[in-house]
């Protein structure tokens, strides 16, 4: 997984170009999850944000513009972090970026919003990640996550493209599985929506 995102950092970054109408039509989930992140951040007063798997900082830019006063982005791909550093430079000391695996990264304190967008697709150890997110989620805060679901149309295509050709495992989720994942990590309430046919958007709240 690390090798794929390191080698194709610019290619993944390009997927978020708003001007590319074809991307909006073929990958609407990319923009739905960004919208949910922005709405969540904008709904809080001066929130702090932890972005796990921040990639090139595309969503980070939007949540900082939406009012985040402190943003920590973590990604295990150094080329992704380099892109994020250039994109978020204008936000000065509101931003800190770390190139490291989240489970080993030196994260201190709690955050009002924890983002996990386009991350759980690739995690064989999802419960460990959810537990650490809970540990860094402030009381009253929430995790905002996106999760793929098996689709008879997109499922086989993704399996061939990522697993067979790209040597990059893909993990799918069910609504019941997501409830268990976040309840097991300690979250008190989980909101799950399925705006498209191939995945879920989640907000999991810490009491």
Label each residue range with its predicted role.
Residues 127-139:
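A short glycine-rich, Lys/Arg-flanked "PGG" loop and its adjoining helix->strand segment in the class I
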Residues 118-119:
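Short catalytic micro-motifs in class I SAM-dependent methyltransferases
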Residues 115:
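A conserved beta-strand element that flanks and buttresses the S-adenosyl-L-methionine
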Residues 141-147:
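Conserved beta-strand signature within the Rossmann-like core of class I S-adenosyl-L-methionine
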Residues 1-42:
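Conserved class I S-adenosyl-L-methionine
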Residues 149-169:
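Short, glycine-/aromatic-enriched active-site segment of Class I SAM-dependent methyltransferases
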Residues 56-103:
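Class I SAM-dependent methyltransferase SAM/SAH-binding core
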Residues 169-185:
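Short alpha-helix
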């Amino acid at each position: 997984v690390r090798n794929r995102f390191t080698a194709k950092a610019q290619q993944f970054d390009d997927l978020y170009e708003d001007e590319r109408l074809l991307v909006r039509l073929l990958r609407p989930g990319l923009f739905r999850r960004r919208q949910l992140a922005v709405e969540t951040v904008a709904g809080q007063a001066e929130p702090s944000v932890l972005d796990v798997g921040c990639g090139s900082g595309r969503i980070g830019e939007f949540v900082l513009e939406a009012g985040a006063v402190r943003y920590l982005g973590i990604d295990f791909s150094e080329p992704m972090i380099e892109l994020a550093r250039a994109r978020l430079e204008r936000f000065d000391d509101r931003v800190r970026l770390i190139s490291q695996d989240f489970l080993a990264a030196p994260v201190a304190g709690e955050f009002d919003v924890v983002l996990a967008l386009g991350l759980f697709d690739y995690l064989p150890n999802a419960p460990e990640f959810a537990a650490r997110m809970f540990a860094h989620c402030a009381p009253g805060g929430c995790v905002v996550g996106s999760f793929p679901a098996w689709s008879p149309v997109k499922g086989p295509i993704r399996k061939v493209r990522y697993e067979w050709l790209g040597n990059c495992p893909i993990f799918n989720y069910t609504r019941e599985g997501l409830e268990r994942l976040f309840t097991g990590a300690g979250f008190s309430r989980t909101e799950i929506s399925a705006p498209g046919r191939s995945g879920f958007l989640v907000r999991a709240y810490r009491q």
